[in-house]
Structure formats: C-alpha cells, structure tokens
C-alpha cells in the first residue's frame, strides 16, 4: 500500500507540475496572440487586393 507521506508527495508533485504547465501555456498563448497582432494577416492582404481590383474595375 501507499503511505500517507507518499500520497502527499505525489499530490504535491502533480499540483506543482500542473501549475508550471498552466504558466507555460499562458506564456506561449500570450506570445502567439502578440505575434498575430504584429504581423499583417494574409486575409487582410487578400481583402485589400480584392477591394483594389473591384475599385479599378468600377473606374473603367
């Protein structure tokens, strides 16, 4: 059988590991969102190109 001390050690280890994983996930998630905000998205470029094409056709 597992003793109370072993169970306590296992519970603390898993708790500590889960907190560390949450912190790492948050750091990665935040950095990804910042990178997405800084770089222009390809959908914006496509939309902008489409609007330019439509506008040039209307002028003719």
Swiss-Prot record:
Subunit of the oligosaccharyl transferase (OST) complex that catalyzes the initial transfer of a defined glycan (Glc(3)Man(9)GlcNAc(2) in eukaryotes) from the lipid carrier dolichol-pyrophosphate to an asparagine residue within an Asn-X-Ser/Thr consensus motif in nascent polypeptide chains, the first step in protein N-glycosylation. N-glycosylation occurs cotranslationally and the complex associates with the Sec61 complex at the channel-forming translocon complex that mediates protein translocation across the endoplasmic reticulum (ER). All subunits are required for a maximal enzyme activity. SUPFAM superfamilies: Oligosaccharyltransferase subunit ost4p. GO terms for cellular component: endoplasmic reticulum membrane. Residues 41-60 have a biased composition (Low complexity). The chain crosses the membrane at residues 7-29. The gene is OST4. This is Dolichyl-diphosphooligosaccharide--protein glycosyltransferase 4 kDa subunit. It is a single-pass type III membrane protein. Pathway: Protein modification; protein glycosylation. Residues 1-6 are lumenal. GO terms for biological process: protein glycosylation. It comes from the Eukaryota. Residues 30-60 are cytoplasmic. Residues 37-60 are annotated as: Disordered.
